[in-house]
Amino acid sequence: MLPSIAKHAASHQIHPLKKHGQNFIFDGSLCDKIVRASGLEENSNVLEIGPGTGGLTRSILHKNPKLLTVIETDERCIPLLNEIKQYHPNLNIIKQDALKLKLSDLNTNKITIISNLPYHIGTELVIRWLKESSLVASMTLMLQKEVVERICAKPSTKAYGRLSVICSLIATVEKCFDVAPTAFYPPPKVYSAIVKLTPLENIPNSDLISKVELITKMAFAGRRKMIKSSLKNLAPNISELLAKLNISNNCRAENLTPNDYLSLASLI
């Protein structure tokens, strides 16, 4: 029988390292709550990034997935994870940098991603996975609360930006719940939150999404500027294109809907 999450970490002398962006969760009930929010079903193929001391890993395994693949770059955690594997042979441990992983490398059916992501790479991973959304069943992720609010933000709000636009064009997004700093060791300086993203059945092709990325980068770089000024270097006839879409030249980036950006991308 495995010891508690905290005792298991202590037995391996694993302490959080800042260079890995580590904030460990020792509360098994919180880990269970995250897995419940994911709606994980038995016999699913699951991916977890940064399992660390294995708290969330254990909760996922209790749902009896077909296969749980964990990606861990901290070699100190590998022996601990191997001890969990002794009780759960459906655990696949890969020592690798998550930023070098392609979902297609896993050679599995639709992947359910459940992770407490390192905050310094969280946004980048979300965007990468959205671009491979045909391989994803859903993503239930712990991120900084501020990032989750940006993912879920609606037009004409302060948090609305590039991330909001791209996420809403590719997936349905749902904020599940907040997590206080005290839930972690060591406590981070900010609140966290759980968000679930489920890819849409019909999504724009990759070329259009790339154009949306370019347009939103330009638009939100001049967030307080009128959209015709922000996008003046996008196309010489930008005012005509905006008029064609019934978008006022006097709008700002935050006033355009995700579909407005998609329509504009289709004209570029």
From Swiss-Prot:
Residues that hold S-adenosyl-L-methionine according to the record: 23, 25, 50, 72, 97, 116
Gene3D superfamilies xref list: Ribosomal RNA adenine dimethylase-like, domain 2, Vaccinia Virus protein VP39
EC class (word): transferase
Localization in the cell: Cytoplasm
Reactions the enzyme catalyzes: adenosine(1518)/adenosine(1519) in 16S rRNA + 4 S-adenosyl-L-methionine = N(6)-dimethyladenosine(1518)/N(6)-dimethyladenosine(1519) in 16S rRNA + 4 S-adenosyl-L-homocysteine + 4 H(+)
SUPFAM superfamilies in the record: S-adenosyl-L-methionine-dependent methyltransferases
A GO-annotated cellular component: cytoplasm
Family: Belongs to the class I-like SAM-binding methyltransferase superfamily. rRNA adenine N(6)-methyltransferase family. RsmA subfamily.
UniProt xrefs under NCBIfam families: ksgA
PANTHER family per record: DIMETHYLADENOSINE TRANSFERASE, DIMETHYLADENOSINE TRANSFERASE-RELATED
Protein name: Ribosomal RNA small subunit methyltransferase A
Species of the source: Rickettsia bellii (strain OSU 85-389)
